[in-house]
Amino acid sequence: GGAALRALAGGAQAQDYDLTIAVLPSPHTAYLKMAETIPDRIAEATGGKVKITLNDSLVGGPQIAAAVRDGRVPMSSALHTYLAAEEPRMGIFNLPGLIDNMPEYAYVCEAFWCEDVDAIWLERWNAISLANGAWCTQQLFSKEPIRTVEDFRNKKLRVHNPQTAALMDALGAKPVPLALSEVMPALERGIIDGLFTSTCYGHGQEYWRLAPNVQNWGLGPINGWAILINKEAWEEMPEELREQVQAEMDRFEGEAIYGYYDFVREAMLDMESKGVTFWVAPDSEKARIFDPQYTQPVYDSWYKRAEEVGFDGKAYIEKVRQTLGKDLLR
């Protein structure tokens, strides 16, 4: 018996680090499909010394970063957008017309933004960011078509960040903050007329059954996520293990970024096979929605929050625009 117990204890020692990663329940999304690869990848990269278990019922979305900060969970796949009110740099991709697609997101990330955000994760959330990715292209799922600027008027739309809320206000819509678990009943009961969400998330939740109009207005099309680990949990690992984990998470990030459109395509093709029609706003209508009378209030509220947090918002946005060459458009 003693030998068997010692063998068990030995096995436990070989399995040096046992970590749980909190994720949002989100079937069919790039976010979850990528996260599901982490346990096997890290076990292989560390020779089984780091064991990671996925859990989708530990923490709600808005708490998913704070839970890591407070040590309630050692790891999570966190969403920047939920923190955009608190820290505006987490919400740059929600500003209309700033970051229009995945290549632009990846470019700005690589240029300076991800490094800036890594420092914020560490300072404000006591977390090390191991990798970045993004949700599939944001779409507007609605019961009735919303295909002109006028169509937004009085529509009750669920939004997930303050920038989109400010834009909806300017357009005469009624932005509604709503927990994800309440979206389906709210659609059923007419509490909301539609919502902005990722293509893949909307596909997995089957929102198209109640909101069959799926429209791409190009409003904050890319929404990021980050794989976080609590600073103390990270520092408990010996350096060699940390290097193995980080090298694997660098590969993971490459797949999340460069394989991004494969996830979007898969979701769109599956929805189309179920009768969903996708609509993309023509440039003429996008030009109307991106008119400064609607977009300026969004930027102004962002600049105001930047000032409260203690950085120069206008200079920050100009840096993004210059990085992407958007200041050169004549």
Regions found by a protein language model. Give the residues of each.
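N-terminal export leaders
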Residues: G1-G2
